[in-house]
Structure formats: C-alpha cells, structure tokens
Amino acid sequence: NIIRNAGHSDSRGVELSLIARPVQPLTLRLSYGYTYARFLDYQKSETVSYTGNMLPLVPRHTLSLNGSYTITPRQGIMDRLVLSVGLNGMGKIYWNEDNLVSQRFYALLNAKASATFGPVTWELWGKNLTDTDYLTYYFKDSAAYGQKGRPVSFGTSLIFDI
C-alpha cells in the first residue's frame, strides 16, 4: 500500500472500559472505542479531492466483551482452572483514501480453558468460533490484493513459568 502526505487531517475519539465482578469467581470486562478521523484538507490532484473523507485503516468503532470464571480447587494438584470467552469487534474501516472500498463491522468469538499446576499452565483454545470472514488488510494497485483473516481454529498451549 502506498502512503501519501495529506494537507491536514483530524482524529478524535474516546475509549471507555468497565470491569465488573458480580460474584467472586466471575470477572466481566467491557471496552468500547470510538474514533472519528477524517481528512480536513487533501487535494490529490486538480480534479480529485479527498477532503472530508475518512482516514484509511482507522476503524470507527472497536468493541471487546470478555468474561472469565476462575475455579480454585481446595484439594488436588491443580491450582486454578480459568474458563473464558471473549467477543472482539471492529467497526467499518476504509482501506484507502478514496473511501471506495471498505469492510463493515465484524466480530470474532474466542474461548479458552486454562489449568494451572504450579509453574505449568495448559490451555485449550478456540479462535473465531463463528468462522467469520474478514480481511486484515487490503490494497489496490494494478490489481486488488487482500489478506483474509484466520478462519476458525483450535489449539493447545503449554506454558512454563520459570
């Protein structure tokens, strides 16, 4: 993708976050971001003006909603079991200055279970559980090129805390 200098742009936004613990083992997290970023003065050529267009690669809205439930057994070899689920969303995004190509809002649903045994944590996880189609990047040159986001995936991780 080619980045060009624009005459003048403006970006304003706000981000809010909330953490709640309605009962001891349950933690809920919510965050929301709003960004309004546009070109105030961008004359590409004598006949083409991008003044007033939205800045490329800047989503208008971002959203994250996560919940985790922690179980701490009183006996046994497991120190902690954490079950978590999260939804991450990205609002409409324009891929270049002309604002002709965009991606609408999408959300990814992820989940994870992790068990901790002393210095070792074993995780089972799933990402993009709804198999949402989305692009992580797009640009147009002599042809259009895009990078698709990852499809639904499952995996496991083994973490050693040394």
Question: Where in the sequence are the language-model features?
Answer:
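Transmembrane beta-barrel architecture of outer membranes
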Residues: R60-S64, Y106-N110, G149-G155
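Flexible, surface-exposed loop regions and adjacent strand-edge segments
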Residues: N1-I2, D41-N53, N99-R104, Y138-Q147
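Gram-negative outer-membrane beta-barrel transporters
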Residues: R4-N96, S157-D161
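Short, basic/aromatic-rich helical patch in the C-terminal catalytic core of site-specific tyrosine
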Residues: L16, A111-A113
